[in-house]
């Protein structure tokens, strides 16, 4: 259910009226007392799809999941809400990449790995997830030790957010003053030239372009004294030269730290990461994290749209890059 789209007061409750089991007396869809929105019983729903077609606000999706995935549920936001399956494993000394379309849980994944969100393992009714249960669930896996350190606060994290254009709404003042407050270890000097900061250090945050805000956000993240660094789309707004410079700086940071990068630019990801986790699913409904692959293999699989090992096709077409524009039929104009 897309709760933000569901508007029971503006429709005739078509989802309830046309539901076959509902019409025979089985409760499948009802309006929640707390939410005031339609809720669907996943146990009694027969997945006929009639409610999907009848809803005037396009608020319903019915998606069947493979049976084996039910054991891999890491986080669920609520009844009939988004679900995330599996997690990547950060590795100290290397850059881990996340690659996939928008709306399938990359931000949720970063939130869990950074400790901002405790995974509820599908128990969404609990107000506060139990870390002991989470650690027991991941016992014997590579991820257990990492999550244990996160839960105990033994790992400090720093996140470069995706939407850098909001930076000027939360901070006012000169770039130099902002970065100076964060520079506790005297590392700003080493970042000045690689990130091209000198040209706008003395300008106000509110006067910066998207590319300049991006570089300020990257510098601010790297100046924080952390053990784990997350960079959400660090190449956005940057030209090709700036992207490569940023990639080099992030690579240097990863020598002694955990680094996780969410990136859509395949060239930057190829240059930057060693291991990539592909993510696929349905936007706003669920996201699945595939097994790790070497970066070149992951990119080729992503372009092909088919994961041979998992026997999963996550895109109905292959992405191809032509070395030159395709030749079209050219017809000469008849002059006589």
Question: Which role does the model predict for each range below?
Answer:
Residues 72-86, 123-210, 224:
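ABC-family P-loop ATPase nucleotide-binding domains
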Residues 204, 233-234, 241:
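Walker B catalytic motif
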């Amino acid at each position: 259910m897309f709760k933000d789209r569901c508007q029971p007061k503006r429709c005739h409750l078509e989802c309830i009226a046309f539901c076959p089991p509902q019409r025979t007396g089985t409760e499948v869809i009802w309006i929640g007392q707390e939410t005031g929105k339609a809720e669907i019983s996943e146990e009694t729903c027969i997945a006929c799809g009639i409610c999907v077609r009848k809803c005037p606000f396009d608020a319903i999706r019915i998606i069947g999941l493979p049976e084996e995935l039910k054991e891999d549920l890491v986080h669920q936001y609520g009844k009939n809400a988004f679900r995330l399956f599996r997690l990547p494993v950060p590795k100290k000394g290397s850059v881990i990449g996340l690659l996939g379309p928008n709306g399938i849980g990359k931000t949720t994944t970063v939130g869990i790995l950074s400790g901002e969100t405790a995974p509820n393992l599908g128990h969404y009714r609990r107000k506060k997830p139990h870390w002991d249960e989470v650690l027991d669930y991941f016992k014997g896996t590579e991820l257990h030790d990492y999550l244990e350190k996160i839960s105990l606060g033994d790992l400090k994290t720093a996140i470069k957010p995706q939407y850098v254009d909001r930076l000027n709404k939360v901070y006012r003042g000169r770039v130099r003053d902002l970065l100076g407050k964060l520079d506790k270890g005297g590392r700003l000097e080493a970042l000045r030239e690689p990130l091209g900061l000198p040209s706008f250090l003395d300008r106000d945050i509110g006067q910066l372009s998207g590319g300049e805000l991006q570089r300020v956000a990257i510098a601010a993240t790297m100046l924080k004294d952390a053990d784990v660094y997350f960079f959400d789309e660090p190449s956005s707004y940057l030209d090709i030269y700036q992207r490569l410079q940023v990639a080099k700086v992030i690579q240097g940071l990863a020598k002694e730290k955990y680094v996780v990068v969410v990136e859509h630019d395949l060239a930057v990801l190829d240059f930057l990461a060693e291991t990539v986790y592909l993510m696929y699913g349905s936007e706003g409904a669920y996201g699945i994290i595939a097994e790790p692959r070497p970066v070149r293999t992951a990119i080729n699989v992503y372009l092909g749209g088919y994961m041979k090992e998992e026997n999963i096709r996550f895109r109905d077409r292959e992405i191809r890059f032509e070395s030159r524009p395709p030749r079209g039929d050219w017809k000469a104009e008849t002059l006589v």
